[in-house]
């Protein structure tokens, strides 16, 4: 039975490359999400330009709020696809480490 040595795994260059790749995706995505999400309440609290009508009686604030739903769906779909790629990479890494152990 394979017993993982997590310190050894964390020290491997391939695992470090994986973490770098994962961080390169997650950190910018999270920053974008939080900025986009919190900009609506901040902008509507301190500015009035979002109150202007955009399409008929629908204001820019409503369009921004609807865009947040779309952004959430798109970001979660992109993350799900990227996570599948990460899972494949980790599975291959585990197989490589098992091969080195035996």
Swiss-Prot record:
Membrane spanning residue stretches: 24-44, 55-75
GO cellular component, one term: plasma membrane
Main location: membrane
Subcellular compartments: Cell membrane
Membrane topology (UniProt): Multi-pass membrane protein
Annotated S-S bridges: none
Keyword field contains S-adenosyl-L-methionine: no
UniProt keyword list: Cell membrane, Membrane, Transmembrane, Transmembrane helix
A Pfam family per the record: DUF485
Stored InterPro entries: DUF485
Matches recorded under PANTHER family: INTEGRAL MEMBRANE PROTEIN-RELATED, MEMBRANE PROTEIN
UniProt protein name: Uncharacterized protein YwcB
Taxonomic path: Bacteria, Bacillati, Bacillota, Bacilli, Bacillales
């Amino acid at each position: 039975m394979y017993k993982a040595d997590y310190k050894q795994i964390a020290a491997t260059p391939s695992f470090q490359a994986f973490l770098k790749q994962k961080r390169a995706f997650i950190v910018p995505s999270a920053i974008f999400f939080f900025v986009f999400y919190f900009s609506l309440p901040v902008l509507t609290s301190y500015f009035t330009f979002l109150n202007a009508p955009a399409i008929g009686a629908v204001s820019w604030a409503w369009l921004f709020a609807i865009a947040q739903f779309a952004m959430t769906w798109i970001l979660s779909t992109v993350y799900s696809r990227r996570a599948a790629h990460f899972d494949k990479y980790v599975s291959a890494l585990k197989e490589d480490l098992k091969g080195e152990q035996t």
